């Protein structure tokens, strides 16, 4: 699922977020803040 350009895909819960995704170390973006 692709997100609109101004949204970010958070891979853990597969949500499109208007806020930044929380990260853990060097892992990919995980979830919405």
UniProtKB/Swiss-Prot annotation:
Subcellular location: Secreted
Site (Essential for stimulation of [3H]ryanodine binding to RYR1): 31, 33
A Pfam family matched in the record: Toxin_27
GO molecular function, one term: calcium channel inhibitor activity
Signal peptide: none
Keywords: Calcium channel impairing toxin, Disulfide bond, Ion channel impairing toxin, Knottin, Neurotoxin, Ryanodine-sensitive calcium-release channel impairing toxin, Secreted, Toxin
Tissue expression: Expressed by the venom gland.
GO cellular component: extracellular region
Principal cellular location given in the protein's record: secreted
Residues spanning the membrane: none
InterPro entries documented for this protein: Scorpion_calcine
Region named Essential for stimulation of [3H]ryanodine binding to RYR1: 23-24
Disulphides: 3-17, 10-21, 16-32
Protein family membership: Belongs to the scorpion calcin family.
Described function: This toxin stabilizes ryanodine receptor 1 (RyR1) opening in a long-lasting subconductance state (60% of the full conductance state). Furthermore, it triggers calcium release from sarcoplasmic vesicles (31 nM are enough to induce a sharp release, and 65% of the total calcium is released after toxin (100 nM) addition) probably by acting as a cell-penetrating peptide (CPP). In addition, it has been shown to dose-dependently stimulate ryanodine binding to RyR1 (EC(50)=3.7 nM).
Domain notes: The presence of a 'disulfide through disulfide knot' structurally defines this protein as a knottin.
Record-given protein name: Vejocalcin
């Amino acid at each position: 699922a692709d997100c609109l350009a101004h949204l970010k895909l958070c891979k853990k819960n597969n949500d499109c977020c208007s806020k930044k995704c929380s990260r853990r170390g060097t892992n990919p973006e995980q979830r919405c803040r």
